[in-house]
């Protein structure tokens, strides 16, 4: 478990131009230099420091957010996924910048009255110029679950997955259901399997664009595996010795898979 330094804001904090991490974002993409978030001064990187907003700190250095549209010179943008291998605290800081950027780009107008929104200078939220309604970043709650059946783990492949990658079951939480109910429903709908012993594992913000992944472990109860091919390309039970390519390191899906395999290995010892 990582320890994040909390930032207490009474207002939006601007950059002083000193050495910092600079997250220049557009959608779920950001500017990387040699695969890393640029570090240094605003002057060094020719960035408009007056438009940079503090979103976090990493190793005692500030992490600033800038929208790519606010920079005169175009910078090559790369998916946030390219940072999955970096330290988790820095990845989460970059994720925060991406989500604030998404907020500023997608909540430009007030859904209450249609007025123009602007970035509120008391907190990181968009506010309507006319009716003054505050609009915070949208966060979509999702579950993700690793299901174990004796010495095997349930893994699924989605049509969007490349290189034959398999992962665990995931889905969005519906209105009026608990997280545990969502776990049971998603597994049943996508695979025909009924699960039991549902238990919390951890969470991960997932800025693609604005999800919060809440992870669970569960055990097989009953049912015959019948993949929903409108959602999945394949689903199957896999043992330690016959694993397919799985989700990359840095994802909570990979952490769930590794935990389940470790539990299986311990039981086999």
From Swiss-Prot:
Reactions the enzyme catalyzes: a 5'-end NAD(+)-phospho-ribonucleoside in mRNA + H2O = a 5'-end phospho-adenosine-phospho-ribonucleoside in mRNA + beta-nicotinamide D-ribonucleotide + 2 H(+); NAD(+) + H2O = beta-nicotinamide D-ribonucleotide + AMP + 2 H(+); NADH + H2O = reduced beta-nicotinamide D-ribonucleotide + AMP + 2 H(+)
Any one of the GO BP annotations: NAD catabolic process
Entry binding sites for a divalent metal cation 2: 186
GO cellular component terms given for this protein: cytosol
UniProt-listed PANTHER family: NAD-CAPPED RNA HYDROLASE NUDT12, NUDIX HYDROLASE, NUDC SUBFAMILY
Subunit and partners: Homodimer.
HAMAP family linked to this entry: Nudix_NudC
Name of this protein: NAD-capped RNA hydrolase NudC
Source species of the chain: Vibrio cholerae serotype O1 (strain ATCC 39541 / Classical Ogawa 395 / O395)
């Amino acid at each position: 478990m990582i320890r994040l330094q909390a930032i207490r804001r009474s207002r939006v904090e601007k950059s002083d131009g000193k050495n910092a991490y600079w997250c220049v974002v557009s959608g779920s993409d950001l500017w990387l230099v040699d695969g890393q978030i640029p570090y240094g001064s605003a002057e060094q990187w020719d960035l408009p420091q007056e438009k940079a907003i503090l979103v976090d700190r990493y190793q005692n250095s500030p992490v600033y957010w800038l929208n790519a549209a606010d920079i005169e010179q175009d910078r090559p943008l790369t998916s946030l996924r390219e940072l999955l291998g970096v330290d988790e605290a820095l990845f989460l800081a970059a994720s925060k910048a991406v989500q604030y950027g998404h907020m500023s780009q997608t909540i430009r107008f007030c859904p209450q009255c249609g007025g123009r929104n602007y970035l509120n200078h008391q907190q990181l939220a968009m506010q309507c110029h006319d009716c003054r309604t505050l609009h915070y970043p949208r966060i979509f709650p999702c579950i993700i679950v690793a299901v174990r059946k004796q010495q095997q783990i349930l893994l699924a492949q989605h049509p969007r997955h490349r290189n034959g990658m398999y992962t665990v079951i995931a889905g969005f939480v519906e209105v009026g259901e608990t997280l545990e109910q969502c776990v049971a429903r998603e597994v049943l709908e996508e695979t025909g399997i009924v699960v039991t012993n549902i238990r919390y594992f951890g969470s991960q913000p997932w800025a693609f664009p604005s999800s919060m992944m809440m992870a669970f472990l569960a055990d097989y109860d009953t049912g015959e595996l019948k993949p929903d091919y409108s959602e999945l390309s394949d689903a199957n039970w896999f043992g330690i010795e016959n694993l397919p390519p799985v989700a990359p390191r840095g994802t909570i899906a990979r952490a769930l898979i590794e935990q389940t395999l470790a539990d299986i290995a311990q039981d086999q010892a």
